Swiss-Prot record:
<feature type="region of interest" description="Disordered">
    <location>
        <begin position="376"/>
        <end position="451"/>
    </location>
</feature>
<feature type="compositionally biased region" description="Basic and acidic residues">
    <location>
        <begin position="406"/>
        <end position="451"/>
    </location>
</feature>
<feature type="compositionally biased region" description="Basic and acidic residues">
    <location>
        <begin position="376"/>
        <end position="386"/>
    </location>
</feature>
<dbReference type="Pfam" id="PF10140">
    <property type="entry name" value="YukC"/>
</dbReference>
<keyword id="KW-0175">Coiled coil</keyword>
<feature type="compositionally biased region" description="Polar residues">
    <location>
        <begin position="387"/>
        <end position="397"/>
    </location>
</feature>
<keyword id="KW-1003">Cell membrane</keyword>
<comment type="function">
    <text>Required for YukE secretion. Probable component or regulator of the ESX/ESAT-6-like secretion system (BsEss). Required to deliver LXG toxins to target cells.</text>
</comment>
<dbReference type="InterPro" id="IPR042565">
    <property type="entry name" value="T7SS_EssB_C"/>
</dbReference>
<feature type="transmembrane region" description="Helical">
    <location>
        <begin position="221"/>
        <end position="241"/>
    </location>
</feature>
<keyword id="KW-0812">Transmembrane</keyword>
<protein>
    <recommendedName>
        <fullName>ESX secretion system protein YukC</fullName>
    </recommendedName>
</protein>
<comment type="similarity">
    <text>Belongs to the EssB family.</text>
</comment>
<feature type="coiled-coil region">
    <location>
        <begin position="362"/>
        <end position="447"/>
    </location>
</feature>
<dbReference type="InterPro" id="IPR018778">
    <property type="entry name" value="T7SS_EssB"/>
</dbReference>
<dbReference type="GO" id="GO:0005886">
    <property type="term" value="C:plasma membrane"/>
</dbReference>
<keyword id="KW-1133">Transmembrane helix</keyword>
């Protein structure tokens, strides 16, 4: 023990205090204590007779061994108790010290010297014997300060025992601990503790107390219900904000289609992905795009009679929806899936017009335009070869091909004109800048000559 820091109890007793299998032992050096005869220590056995106590006196040492009942706990276990139990223990500790009236036995109220039973009643392990075993004398002030520090430790527990005992004026304690340490009498301290107990009891009455097992069962049932309700809540939110508006849009578009209000059908369904719509609605939307597209009556009739019917592959519906929405790349992809050259050619022609309307000076757009031109030539060649066999279902006739070619030429010419105009404008601006620079230089030269 010499290499270890001694506890407050050991310093006060000038002894070694240990917890062993045999119980709590206090070892005193005979040369340091006033004990003359071992019989003088037997008075310790008279208090708390249900503690098993042994006193061994040798030439050099006095060893006192104390074994409380196995159900008793050391002071340090008070930290695990609930708040009300801590205050009740503190109350009984104050009473135990206040009611101690044995003149030959002297108290030392240190945490290492205290145990408590299941009723939270505190008991002291060691007592000093007057003029024989430390502490020798009754020191009211020491006991009072030790009591307040022990009560603060039991209730608060944020600091060590000696911090509460010695540093009340320098350390910042909790309001509860500070109130205990500032108490001026036993009655004041008991009243303070009783007030806190009453407050906790009043607060406890506002709660419903149930067994822990029942609480755990209810908690897990509640968690299970939450887990089950989350998907239902998500579905309800989806139905409220997405499914219901979508269903209403389908109903409205169907009414508009029956009334041949094709533009209304298109606008009503514009924000919904085509593949998410039922096939019958896809058919109505595709037909609406065919009707509003400037295809000519013959071609429109040909498409509706042969390609876009309720018995058609839904890919035909998706083609015309993508085509009508200006998503020509997707339309080209569907045409390739269907291996229908007219679809490919028609979407490529529109895609080319779309590219020509953009900035053809952009390198990426120009590459894409070259690729489209190449595909158009290939598709046109294949159509020429298969014209006779596909004449009945041909989407684009010869006159329309010429019209599309003319439109493409016009778009190309327009793009070329815009490009030439932009270049001419750039040249003029560059020339103007040069002239301005020349004039500025001449002015500077004139100023130099004047000087």
């Amino acid at each position: 023990m010499s290499g270890e820091q001694k506890s407050y109890l050991e310093n006060q007793l000038e002894a070694v205090a240990e917890k062993t299998d045999a119980g709590y032992t206090f070892t005193f050096q005979r040369e340091k204590i006033k004990l003359l005869d071992g019989l003088e220590a037997n008075v310790i056995k008279d208090i708390n007779p249900f503690f098993h106590k042994e006193i061994d006196v040798t030439d050099d040492e006095v060893i006192i061994t104390i074994q409380p009942p196995s159900s008793y706990k050391a002071f340090r276990f008070m930290k695990a108790k609930d708040k009300k139990s801590k205050w009740q223990f503190a109350y009984q500790l104050v009473q135990a010290v206040q009611q101690h009236n044995l003149s030959r036995l002297n108290l030392i109220v240190a945490p290492e010297n205290i145990v408590f039973d299941k009723g939270l009643t505190p008991y002291f392990l060691h007592y000093g014997v007057k003029e024989s075993i430390p502490p020798y004398e009754r020191d009211e002030e020491r006991v009072w300060q030790e009591l307040k520090a022990a009560a603060a430790l039991a209730v608060d527990g944020a600091f060590a025992f000696e911090d509460y005992l010695k540093f009340n004026e320098t350390l910042t304690f909790s309001a509860e601990a500070k109130a205990i340490l500032d108490a001026e009498s036993y009655d004041d301290l008991l009243e303070l503790i009783q007030t806190h107990i009453d407050e906790l009891e009043a607060k406890a009455k506002t709660y419903i107390h149930i067994p822990r097992k029942k609480w755990n069962i209810q908690r897990y049932i509640g968690l299970g219900l939450i887990v089950l309700l989350v998907p239902a809540l998500i579905y309800s939110m989806y139905a409220l904000f997405f499914a219901q508006p979508k269903h209403q849009a389908i109903v409205d578009s169907n009414r508009a289609f029956l009334n041949k209000q094709y533009s209304e059908v298109i606008s009503t369904l514009s924000k919904y992905d085509a593949e998410s719509l039922p096939e019958s609605v896809q058919y109505q939307l595709a037909t609406s795009y065919v009707e509003v597209e400037n295809l000519g009556s013959a071609k429109t009739k040909n498409i509706e009679n042969n390609l876009v019917t309720l018995q058609s592959d839904p890919q035909h519906f998706l083609y015309w929806i993508d085509y009508g929405r200006g998503e020509y790349k997707e339309a080209i992809s569907i045409g390739r899936k269907l291996e229908y050259n007219d679809y490919i050619y028609f979407a490529l022609a529109k895609y080319k017009q779309q590219l020509l309307s953009e900035d053809t000076n952009d390198e990426d757009i120009q590459k894409e335009l070259d690729s489209v031109n190449s595909e158009l030539e290939k598709a046109q060649k294949e159509r020429q070869e298969n014209k006779q066999s596909n004449s009945e279902t041909s989407l684009v006739d010869t006159s329309e091909e010429q019209t599309q070619t003319d439109e493409e030429k016009q778009a190309e010419e327009k793009a070329a004109e815009e490009k030439a105009a932009a270049e001419e404008k750039a040249k003029k601006e560059e020339q103007k800048e040069k002239e301005d620079e020349k004039k500025e230089t001449e002015k500077k030269d004139e100023k130099k000559d004047d000087k």
